[in-house]
């Protein structure tokens, strides 16, 4: 069952301007250490940051909160599964909200799609609730 959908379009030029103007202050306020490390290694760091910014906005929309109700930028981070597929790792208020919207007996799975075509970066997030796997004790 789908419990949340969000999308966002980010202007890479706007993210570049924020990086130029605010530098580390912007990077550390909005992005996790993993996101900063990954983006800083890219030839086009601004595009990488813009995709991650769009992912956070899309995830906040899928959670139904936006950037309020205890959900902060660094509570959501883009990470990659072993396959390389991107997903979101949630902590703090974002994780609490995910737990609130996940029905009992279900496990939330976050699906993330990222793309960019200068000057835009785009992200789609779908939060799906699937039946929880039975525990070994059952």
UniProtKB/Swiss-Prot annotation:
Catalytic activities: apo-[ACP] + CoA = holo-[ACP] + adenosine 3',5'-bisphosphate + H(+)
Taxonomic placement: Bacteria, Pseudomonadati, Pseudomonadota, Alphaproteobacteria, Caulobacterales
Functional summary from the UniProt entry: Transfers the 4'-phosphopantetheine moiety from coenzyme A to a Ser of acyl-carrier-protein.
Source species: Phenylobacterium zucineum (strain HLK1)
Protein name: Holo-[acyl-carrier-protein] synthase
GO cellular component: cytoplasm
Entries under NCBIfam families matching the protein: acpS (TIGR00516), pantethn_trn (TIGR00556)
Record bears the keyword Transit peptide: no
Lipid metabolism is among the record's keywords: yes
């Amino acid at each position: 069952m789908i419990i949340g959908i969000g999308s966002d379009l980010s202007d890479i030029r706007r993210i570049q301007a924020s990086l130029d103007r605010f530098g580390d202050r912007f990077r550390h306020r909005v992005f996790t250490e993993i996101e900063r490390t990954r983006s800083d290694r890219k030839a086009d760091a601004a595009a990488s940051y813009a995709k991650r910014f769009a992912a956070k906005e899309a995830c906040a929309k899928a959670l139904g909160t936006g950037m309020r109700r205890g959900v902060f930028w660094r509570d959501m981070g883009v990470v990659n599964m072993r396959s390389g597929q991107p997903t979101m790792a949630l902590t703090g208020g974002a994780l609490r909200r995910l737990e609130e919207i996940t029905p009992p007996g279900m496990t939330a799975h976050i699906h993330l799609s990222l793309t960019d075509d200068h000057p835009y970066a785009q992200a789609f997030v779908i939060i799906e609730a699937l039946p929880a796997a039975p525990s070994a004790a059952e």
